[in-house]
Structures are given as structure tokens and as C-alpha cells.
Amino acid sequence: MAAVPDRERALDLALAQIDKQFGKGSVMRLGERPVVQTAVVPTGSIALDVALGVGGLPRGRVIEVYGPESSGKTTVALHAVANAQRAGGIAAFVDAEHALDPEYARALGVDTDALLVSQPDTGEQALEIADMLVRSGALDIIIIDSVAALVPRAEIEGEMGDSHVGLQARLMSQALRKMTGVLSNTGTTAIFINQLREKIGVMFGSPETTTGGRALKFYASVRLDVRRIESLKDGTDVVGNRTRVKVVKNKVAAPFKQAEFDIMYGKGISREGSLIDVGVEQAIIRKSGAWYTYEGDQLGQGKEKAREFLRENPDVAAEIEKKILEKLGVGAGAGDATGGPELPPVDF
């Protein structure tokens, strides 16, 4: 075994050669690198921001949002777009399903005039456009809706009934190999919305699976399972859904946490409702019977009245949000799309 000084000298020579050939900083000691905050894009629900552990969706990463039809997947993605735009960011939406509703997006707070939208004809075209936009370095967030709608060119040009086994999976695998490094370097968040399918002949365990092969499961830093758990009614009219999101994979914090929040029809995620739920859970808001109080001041009788009070008093809502984040140790940077909690990212 070589003496320690000889090994150190050999390592220094190798590092110098690598720096010369590939550029300074190609290899570095982890301790030399300053601890960088995990920059995030808030989701619009404080319950989900807390469940993610860092105050929102991490920037520079691949995110997969999947679930049954009409569960709220696109709503979650559009709220992230709205929050990124509010912080001065540029957003793009690759609408492979050709189903984006501009009016609904506007109701959620999306600046539709500034939103870049593409409605590609083939899966190759969709992913090539996404790759070029990300490589520009100008994007903050990009949504691909959905993976299931990324149909390979060969399938579109072929006949009905033709077999195209594995084409979409290979397409996704190649695209993610190309995009992942660029996303990290540019700090762009890529949200892939995905659908569920049933595996035939499964006797034990869940028969559910997502489309597009295994590549997205591997490359995604965060995977969110979105489910509608109950309908919200005003008398006999259904006015929204109670939604549960499970963080099934998380590379920036502890996984397997759950969040529940309300999605109101035509309005999106109820930020105030989420604040009330988490505030009561953390004893920041007090619930006595049907009354909700905060620091001795009554918010209202019943959740709807309390929600209305917070909507009309955004400064009180912001104060409650700040206290919740501080109590749970989630950084103040969760309030914008450029900062994050002062915690080093943890890779599992």
C-alpha cells in the first residue's frame, strides 16, 4: 500500500488533470461546497408544503404527479405554476392531452398571457420542445400533461391494432436521461402528470401502475399520489372535493407523509382551508365547538366563515402561515419560488 503523502500527491495530480480537461469544479470535495438552501416552488396548500418537508416542490428536479381521473393532478400543477409566476418566474405547459382550460387556469392565479403553451402532435415533438425550453435556462417550471398522452410518432402514423411494445417507455427513458442534468443546472422544476392503469392478473398487492415505463419512477425526486376522498357539499350541491396526497417518494426529505386539503370547483385549492386544518392540528388556531379563534380573536363560526375571514384578511393568513412553518421547522423560503429552508438537501 502506497504511503499517505504519495496517495495525496497522486490524487492532486489526477484532480489537476480533470480540472484541465473538463473544467474547474468538475470534481470537488463535498465539504468545500457551501450548504445551499433547497429552493422550492410552493404548491398552494400549506399541508402539502409541510408534507414535502422543504416547503414546496424542489427546484431543479423531476416531479411526478399521478392518480385517478379528476383527482386534482392538473390543479396541483397549475397552482405551482401560479406561485412560480408570482415570484417573477417563467412557466411553460406542454399540453399533450390538448385539454388545458385557460379560464380555469386564470381562476387559479395563472398569468395565462405570460404562460408558454405547446400542443404537440407526437410524444417525440413534446419532449423535444420541453428539452429545448429547459436548455434555454430561462424557465422556472415546466408541466408535461400527461405522460400517457405522449404517443410515439410510429404509433400515430401506424394502423389501429398495430403493436408498439415498449416504444413509449423507451421514449421516456431517453428524454429523462437527456433532461435530468440540465434541469439541475438550470434550476427548472419539471412536473410530469401521469395516469393510472391496471395490471392484469395481479392477485396480491395493488394492481395499479403508471404509464410510460419505469424510467420516470427512477428519475423523479418526488412522486405524489393524488386521490379524491370525499365530495364537499353546500346543501345538496357538490361544490368541491376533499383531496389526499401521499408523498410516495421524496429525495429531499422524509417520504411517505400525507396531506389533505380542499379543492373547490372553479377556484382550485383552498389555501385558507388548508391553513385552518394545519393551524388547528398544530394548536395555533383554537377550535371550540363550531367556533375558530386565533390569539383570542374569533375567525368565525364554522369552517366556511373562518375561511372567508382569512380570505378578507390576508395579513392574518400570512401570520398564521409563518407561525405554522416556524413551528414545524419548514423554512421561511417556502413563501416564494426562489428561496428555501436553511437545510441541506438529503439524498436517500
Swiss-Prot record:
Keyword Cytoplasm attached: yes
Coiled coil region boundaries: none
Keyword Glycoprotein: no
Pfam families, A to Z: RecA, RecA_C
GO-annotated biological processes: DNA recombination; DNA repair; SOS response
PROSITE patterns in UniProt: RECA_1, RECA_2, RECA_3
Positions annotated to bind ATP: 67-74
Protein role: Can catalyze the hydrolysis of ATP in the presence of single-stranded DNA, the ATP-dependent uptake of single-stranded DNA by duplex DNA, and the ATP-dependent hybridization of homologous single-stranded DNAs. It interacts with LexA causing its activation and leading to its autocatalytic cleavage.
Protein name from the UniProt record: Protein RecA
Name of the gene encoding the protein in the UniProt record: recA
